[in-house]
Amino acid sequence: MTTPANAQNASKTWELSLYELHRTPQEAIMDGTEIAVSPRSLHSELMCPICLDMLKNTMTTKECLHRFCSDCIVTALRSGNKECPTCRKKLVSKRSLRPDPNFDALISKIYPSREEYEAHQDRVLIRLSRLHNQQALSSSIEEGLRMQAMHRAQRVRRPMPGSDQTTTMSGGEGEPGEGEGDGEDVSSDSAPDSAPGPAPKRPRGGGAGGSSVGTGGGGAGGVGGGAGSEDSGDRGGTLGGGTLGPPSPPGAPSPPEPGGEIELVFRPHPLLVEKGEYCQTRYVKTTGNATVDHLSKYLALRIALERRQQQEAGEPGGPGGGASDAGGPDGGGGEGGGTRGGDGPEEPALPSLEGVSEKQYTIYIAPGGGAFTTLNGSLTLELVNEKFWKVSRPLELCYAPTKDPK
């Protein structure tokens, strides 16, 4: 028994979805009208959702009509996910796909040379990575300056490990008139009452610095002061006002941070050394794409921070404190433990770091030990090393304050 023809036609009726029912038809453009399309929207239309690159050998799903690269969709089906990566509709096998040569022809019309398009993308990526590297360098320099300033401030506030012991042996620096000390005075007072034992270990003989530390501690205080001068001589005399021992050398290099590419020896200009204005040699390690302006701003910030920390430590106001550019936080602060300068005048206002600029200092180089050459601020250190230095030792630069910074 055969089925009536009208029944067959009724079963094959196309049922429209809500989207198709509300969709208005668009007329095809048959003349030479041009429509401007942004590259971003065009790229999203021609992009494969799997590899996020331009479609290559386009394959279209038969049910949901989503487009993918041939290799991408075949690999996705082989991995076990028998569904469309975009809408999760069921895909049995490669038989649910069909090639789309018309879309490939459209892509070849828009981008005639695919190799040129890929080369342009590579150039854009290289330029973006270079810009990000410069931003990372500047942020790394700022972060390093903040961390160094924080650590130096902590070193100023924290007493040295040997200062507590020498202070107690001298009978207490803050209370010179008391007869009850903490160190040898207590042990000598309680010696007759306690059981006999081994004699207390006396410190090594004191020198001329004993009288400057033990101001009110008697003879034992003088001996303790001498020991303090010998033990803390290599620390730059942090217990007293600079008479205990020679200060630490100002040009002592700090260990360079890892990851740098160029090592620098930063010295003041010889004319400044003769005048006694600057005497500190700085050792810096940084990447080759840092510019001379970066170094100038780093130097201005560093010197401003050091002067600020010297004023906070009370070095300029004390009778024995040193006030030089190379002093750092280790110079003495006068009598009384190097904290403040005694009963001196009121301290000046701390220098502000807001006006620091790379124009405050000029960078020079003396290639071959000859005349000094002023370096342009836009030059990178790698270019300076190749153009002026050309030797296999750290790059040596000199700095001096700019006479008329603009």
UniProtKB/Swiss-Prot annotation:
Residue window of motif Nuclear localization signal: 201-204
Region described as Necessary for transcriptional repression: spans on this chain: 30-234
Pfam families membership: RAWUL, zf-C3HC4_2
Protein name in UniProt: E3 ubiquitin-protein ligase RING1
Sequence segments annotated as region (Disordered): 151-263, 309-354
Compartments where located: Nucleus speckle
Subunit structure comment from the entry: Component of chromatin-associated Polycomb (PcG) complexes. Part of the E2F6.com-1 complex in G0 phase composed of E2F6, MGA, MAX, TFDP1, CBX3, BAT8, EUHMTASE1, RING1, RNF2/RING2 MBLR, L3MBTL2 and YAF2. Interacts with CBX2 and PCGF6. Component of a PRC1-like complex. Component of repressive BCOR complex containing Polycomb group subcomplex at least composed of RYBP, PCGF1, BCOR and RNF2/RING2. Interacts with BMI1, PHC2, PCGF2, RNF2; CBX6, CBX7 and CBX8. Interacts with MN1. Interacts with USP26.
GO molecular function, one term: ubiquitin-protein transferase activator activity
Residue ranges covered by zinc fingers (RING-type): 48-88
Biological process terms in GO annotation: anterior/posterior pattern specification; camera-type eye morphogenesis; chromatin remodeling; negative regulation of DNA-templated transcription; protein ubiquitination
PROSITE patterns membership: ZF_RING_1, ZF_RING_2
Pathway in which this enzyme or protein is active: Protein modification; protein ubiquitination
Comp. bias (Pro residues): 246-258
